Amino acid sequence: ASDAAKRLADIGFGVVTSVQGRGTLPEDHKATLGAYNIYQPVEDFYKTCDAILVVGSRLRSNETLNYKLKLPSPHYQVDVDLDVLNRPYKPDMLVLGDSQLVMEALADKLDGRLNTDKEFIVDLQSARKKAIEYLRDGFKPYKPLVDAIQATGGADFIWVRDVTVSNSTWGNRSVLLNRPYDGVHAMGGGIGQSVQMAIGAAIAAPDRKVVCLVGDGGLQVNIGEMATAIQEGVNICVILMNSKDYEVIKNIQDNSFGGRKYFADLYTPDFEAHAESVGWSYQMFNNLSCVKSKFSSVLKSGGLKLLEVDMKAIGPYARAFGGPPVRQPKTRKKG
């Protein structure tokens, strides 16, 4: 339904997507908020909007602060499933139908008739800019890596991500996507699915670059798929963010259990030796000073590449990720 979504954006709608809906509208389009739905500047922007049209989204807890995100009202929804009326966000009006057909019909009705406030896009862009700045501040010192992926990949790569702290911190939002199928992610939350998804993407689109983001825990779950990739003769660049532990578990233990640590330290194999044993080329990054030039040369050369980022050497994220964000209840002042 990307063509219909673009028509609505061109006549005055703003667009925000779920993580799985990224690329429905090119993320450099002036009218998109990207997937920055959960950030305070975007919620503040929502307060100025007259209505919201939700198309095909389940408005998942992970992307709505556990259903506490305040959406514009009235809330109109387009879906093929009547059960949407039984979900936490109940629409004021539901249209049962195909998203492309309904949005095309809506665009036909509104084209030339929609009179949007001139400040609407200005305010939307301001909200997005503030959300991006907040997110980028949180993933220091890994900004050079994120910028290198964007700069060298351009609009011509498929971005496959495992469930890992690095993806939750920046991979889900910071690398721009321009087409509906440019992003591949395991929405269910289980680690260890990325390499096989990357193999599938590379087989489906052999002329495009496939970049895969994975953590050390996730790669150990599907490490045998590296041999499968050789057998299938595909071109994949895997970025391995190696923290040598279950980082998110430790962060949750810090947040919720007073910092006591159990069952979160992880034995990690020699990934270089494993890569060489199955025929992958390998590079280690224990600093990010030259990451842009090195990453560019890797993408140009093709083949199967494993790029290991030593997170112990580079350091932790400025803002720790301890699970999907939720809105904490306000505490009453004792009188």
Protein language model regions, located:
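Glycine-rich, anion-gripping cofactor-binding loops and their flanking helix/strand elements
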Residues: A1-Y76, L176-D207, N222-I223, N255, ...
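Active-site diphosphate/adenylate-binding microenvironment
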Residues: L8, Q125-V195, A201-A202
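Short, well-ordered beta-to-alpha junction loops that form the rim of enzyme active sites
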Residues: S18, D162-S166, V309-K312
